[in-house]
From Swiss-Prot:
The keyword Secreted appears for this protein: yes
GO molecular function: neuropeptide hormone activity; peptide hormone receptor binding; pituitary adenylate cyclase activating polypeptide activity
Organism whose genome encodes this protein: Cyprinus carpio
GO biological process per UniProt: adenylate cyclase-activating G protein-coupled receptor signaling pathway; neuron projection development; neuropeptide signaling pathway; positive regulation of ERK1 and ERK2 cascade; regulation of protein localization
Keyword rRNA-binding: no
UniProt-listed InterPro entries: Glucagon_GIP_secretin_VIP, VIP/GHRH-like
Coarse class of the protein's main subcellular location: secreted
Origin superkingdom: Eukaryota
Name this polypeptide is given: Somatoliberin
Intracellular or extracellular location(s): Secreted
Length: 45
């Protein structure tokens, strides 16, 4: 049971980390170039 609990917590933390990293790169892209803002809308749809 302890293994399962750790696995779930680890996966949750990993998901939050990757989501934060994705947000960070997204924000960096927006700040980086003005013309790239239009391109950012496509992957989200």
């Amino acid at each position: 049971h302890a293994d399962g609990m750790f696995n779930k917590a680890y996966r949750k933390a990993l998901g939050q980390l990757s989501a934060r990293k994705y947000l960070h790169t997204l924000m960096a892209k927006r700040v980086g170039g003005g013309s790239m803002i239009e391109d950012d809308n496509e992957p989200l749809s």
